[in-house]
Amino acid sequence: MSVSVIIKWGGQEYSINTLSEEDTVLDLKQSIKSLTGVLPERQKLLGLKLKGKPADDNVKLGDLKLKPNTKIMMMGTREESLEDVLAPPPENDDVVNDFDIEEEVTEVENREENLAKIARRVKDYKVEELNPPRPGKRLLVLDIDYTLFDHKSCAETGHELMRPFLHEFLTSAYEDFDIVIWSATSMKWIDAKMKELGVTDNPNYKITFMLDSAAMITVHTPKRGVVEVKPLGVIWGKYSEFYNRKNTIMFDDIGRNFLMNPQNGLKIRPFMKAHLNREKDKELYKLSQYLKEIAKLDDFSGLNHKHWERYLSKKQNQ
């Protein structure tokens, strides 16, 4: 029987359907090389496992019991990688096309059909708790792509694309905040990225739970048409005894994700071109200090997160 897989790498998807169940993982890697230019020895295929362990090169594809068009994320770099790493992101990227949300907010935040969609997510979306909520803690909701991780550049491992100070930031935040990850992708990729970054099982902090694109809703905006957003009301509805508008902050590089809860959103600078910017990006380091300051407050609703740096500077100079 033939085997068909889709390789996700460098922001692109590559279909491979020329292999059989008798072919091996190494044969798959050779096919990937012909499409991407990444040598087999430089490829790391996330989620390709046999009996819970990464599949060796000599394992037959038939033994992996892959479903048709299984998606596999690859880490790996071409020999001439820096040319690709330094290339500008595509012009249609979400970060480029993001828009200032202020003028749209009043139109969508309290619209009845949007609140009804949130109510349906509260009722139907299944949250898989990794660790129980802690009474008295605030809530920090974090995006992944371009917030914690440069997902477009190519690299050998996720650690090369990890935003500087990530683990220090999460360790510090965990002292005052329960941490939730919310990404506009599927849970399969969220799991893979968090494991690759060493977040899932880190001994210094715990993730309360993770949300995927199925927890998002679509809203109609007057100027931009239909867009997908991350409504915090889904979390507040499911965990009303722990979290609310007064104790929640959300970091995302895409402002429109805050359309249903603009007061709680902090638009983080996107982390891109990791190989160029790794040495100078201090966003998470500074934001950990901001979180320390606002954790002293009982109510975040008087804050304007757009001016978080000004607020932090003022507090540090007192």
Swiss-Prot record:
Cofactors: Mg(2+)
Phylogenetic placement of the source organism: Eukaryota, Metazoa, Chordata, Craniata, Vertebrata
Source species of the chain: Danio rerio (Zebrafish)
Gene (UniProt): ublcp1
SMART domains noted in UniProt: CPDc (SM00577), UBQ (SM00213)
Protein name, entry field: Ubiquitin-like domain-containing CTD phosphatase 1
Reactions catalysed according to its record: O-phospho-L-seryl-[protein] + H2O = L-seryl-[protein] + phosphate; O-phospho-L-threonyl-[protein] + H2O = L-threonyl-[protein] + phosphate
UniProt keywords, alphabetically: Hydrolase, Magnesium, Metal-binding, Nucleus, Protein phosphatase
InterPro entries: FCP1_dom (IPR004274), HAD-like_sf (IPR036412), HAD-SF_hydro_IIID (IPR011943), HAD_sf (IPR023214), Ubiquitin-like_dom (IPR000626), Ubiquitin-like_domsf (IPR029071), UBLCP1 (IPR051658)
UniProt GO BP: regulation of proteasome assembly
Domain named FCP1 homology: residues: 133-294
Domain-level remarks: The Ubiquitin-like domain mediates interaction with proteasomes.
One GO term describing the cellular component: nucleus
